[in-house]
């Protein structure tokens, strides 16, 4: 099945729903899967999938958007493709609105705040708008940079409206 137990010494804190793509856990996919998997919470505590991202959060607030099964980040923090848009709070608030789990919200709020601060410090332009890359946005099949830039890796010196709105 697609429910994976954490590997020993991975730093993951619980079993998780796997996208069955390459053995890695993805922030974007996991956040959106949780919005649907919440309906099966009597079968498995799917929302805890996101706890593995919080457990792998760096001291400065960075969370890698893709993490290997052994717990290693797939990208360095300053790589333009290293992290995804700030969609974890969206998934968490949807879960909270359905289940009213205030204890979970209290537990994860510091991690969400630290990640927000990291994004604000490292993925914004001088005017406060956000940037990312094709892979970083999670919508890597929607090239939007000019042809002279790499659609996967480059921010194209643009303001990424979808990231600003998230």
Which role does the model predict for each range below?
Residues 1-25, 44-48, 52:
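Low-complexity, Ser/Thr/Pro/Gly-enriched N-terminal "stalk/linker" regions
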Residues 5, 59, 94:
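Conserved helix-loop functional segments at active or binding sites
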Residues 14, 19, 65-87, 120-166:
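The feature captures the catalytic groove of carbohydrate-active enzymes
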Residues 20, 27-28, 32, 71-78, ...:
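The substrate-binding groove and active-site-proximal loops of carbohydrate-active enzymes
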Residues 26, 43, 78-81, 85, ...:
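Solvent-exposed, acidic/flexible segments
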Residues 31-44, 87-104, 165-166:
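Well-ordered alpha-helical scaffold segments within catalytic/enzyme domains
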Residues 42-55, 102-122:
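Extended, well-ordered alpha-helical scaffold segments
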